[in-house]
C-alpha cells in the first residue's frame, strides 16, 4: 500500500452529472457570470490562466439570478456528498480520525481550461496566513483529457490524469507542491475546494 498522501477515487460522480455541471458552467459563462483568474487575482497569464465560477453553499445570500440559484444548490450538494464518501476513506487510511475536526469549505470553484491554459507555476494550498486552515485539496475531474491537463506533484513525481467522475485528495501543505499542466487537446473542466479545520 502506497502512502504518498495523493489519493484518486474513480467513478465517484456519474457521467450525466458531470456533463450537467459542465453545461451549467457554460450557461453561467455565456451569461457573463464567470471570471478569468487573471482579472480576479491580478496574476500574469503565465501564472494562472483559466475561466472560473464560484459556487457557494448559500447562494440565497447572493444577488438573485435565475441561472445560478437553484442549480448552484444542487451542484454543491452533489459535490459535498461525493466528497464525504472519499474523505471518510482518506482519513481512515491515513488515521486522521482522532486528531482534528474538519469540514468542507463553503465555496467551490468550477474551472474551465482550454488548450494552452493552466495553473502553470508550482504552488501549494496553505500559501499564506489566510489559507492556513486548508487541510486538504479536493478536486473533481468533470471530463477526460486525452493529452496534458494533469495535476503534477513536484516532490512525489506523480501526474494525475483527468478522468471524468474521479476525485483527487491531497494535503494542502508545501510537501504537496503541485501545478496544473496545460491541456494539449480539448478542454478541461474541474471542481475544487478544500477540507478545512473547524477550530
Label for each model-derived stretch:
Residues 1-167, 175-199:
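Fe(II)/2-oxoglutarate oxygenase catalytic core
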Amino acid at each position: 500500500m502506497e502512502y504518498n498522501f495523493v489519493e484518486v477515487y474513480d467513478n465517484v460522480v456519474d457521467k450525466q452529472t458531470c456533463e450537467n455541471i459542465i453545461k451549467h458552467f457554460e450557461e453561467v459563462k455565456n451569461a457573463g457570470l464567470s471570471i478569468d483568474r487573471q482579472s480576479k487575482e491580478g496574476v500574469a497569464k503565465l501564472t494562472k490562466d483559466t475561466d472560473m465560477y464560484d459556487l457557494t453553499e448559500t447562494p440565497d445570500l447572493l444577488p438573485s439570478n435565475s441561472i445560478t440559484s437553484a442549480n448552484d444548490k444542487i451542484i454543491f450538494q452533489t459535490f459535498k456528498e461525493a466528497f464525504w464518501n472519499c474523505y471518510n476513506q482518506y482519513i481512515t487510511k491515513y488515521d486522521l480520525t482522532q486528531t482534528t475536526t474538519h469540514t468542507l469549505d463553503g465555496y467551490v470553484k468550477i474551472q474551465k481550461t482550454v488548450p494552452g491554459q493552466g495553473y502553470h507555476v508550482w504552488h501549494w494550498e496553505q500559501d499564506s496566513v489566510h489559507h492556513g486552515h486548508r487541510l486538504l485539496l479536493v478536486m473533481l475531474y468533470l471530463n477526460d483529457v486525452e493529452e496534458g491537463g494533469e495535476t503534477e506533484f513536484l516532490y512525489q513525481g506523480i501526474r494525475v490524469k483527468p478522468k471524468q467522475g474521479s476525485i483527487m485528495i491531497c494535503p494542502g501543505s508545501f510537501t504537496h507542491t503541485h501545478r496544473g499542466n496545460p491541456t494539449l487537446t480539448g478542454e478541461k473542466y474541474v471542481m475544487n475546494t478544500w477540507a478545512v479545520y473547524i477550530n
